[in-house]
Regions:
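PRPP-associated nucleotide enzymes
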Residues: 1-203
């Protein structure tokens, strides 16, 4: 079972980097009140920790989006399931994401937000899986550059499980979970896996 998962990022490494991102946002938005927009559900744990590291006034909003597969359309069709109700015109908005890979969903969301006459719009992502990018996305605040592997934990899920893990784990082969959906649960019950190579910190 040693091939079920390995640690990509330990809790301590995540918290250190989140603190650095929070301090950067604090400095960049001094004298302003940014609005952090979290995308449900994956970004909630990252958002909660990030908020604690921002040393100034800040507001929070939530959105939920979904992507539906469509054979004639690469990446599928995106739909907003839960929108922001109040007017954000003139506000400084930071979209908080757990992970950005192809950029298709985020690109749709950013285009939607830009139509609201914002004062400014930036992106803060814990993980950037840039080698999967299809649509160019400018991410001002990046936690780590993520390898091209499936990851779970710290808000990231597989079939709604494992969001509550304080670490981020790599699942090298999805075939294991396809044949046994409980394989990772069984593995974790015996203790967390050994540390693997960490993701790269974005400088």
């Amino acid at each position: 079972m040693s091939d079920v998962a390995r640690v990509l990022l330990e809790r301590e490494a995540i918290q250190r980097r989140v603190a650095e991102l929070g301090h950067a946002i604090t400095g960049d938005y001094e004298g302003r009140v940014p609005v952090l927009v979290s995308i449900l559900k994956g970004g909630t744990m990252f958002l909660a920790d990030l908020l604690r590291q921002i040393g100034g006034p800040v507001e929070v909003r939530f959105m939920a989006i979904s992507r539906y597969a469509n054979g004639a359309e690469p990446g599928g069709r995106v739909r907003i399931l839960m929108d922001i109700e109040d007017d954000l015109a003139g506000r400084d908005v930071i979209v908080v994401e757990d992970i950005v890979d192809t950029g298709l969903t985020l690109s749709y969301l950013l285009a939607n937000l830009r139509r609201r006459a914002l004062g400014s719009l930036e992106v803060c992502a814990l993980l950037d899986r840039a080698n999967r990018r299809i649509v160019p996305i400018e991410i001002r605040y990046v936690g780590f550059v993520c390898p091209d592997e499936f990851v779970v934990g710290y808000g990231l899920d597989h079939n709604e499980r494992y969001r509550n893990l304080s670490q981020i784990l790599v699942v090298p082969s999805m075939d294991v979970l396809a044949s046994d959906p409980d394989a990772l649960d069984v593995y974790l019950s015996g203790g967390l896996p050994d540390q693997g190579a960490e993701a790269t910190v974005e400088s």
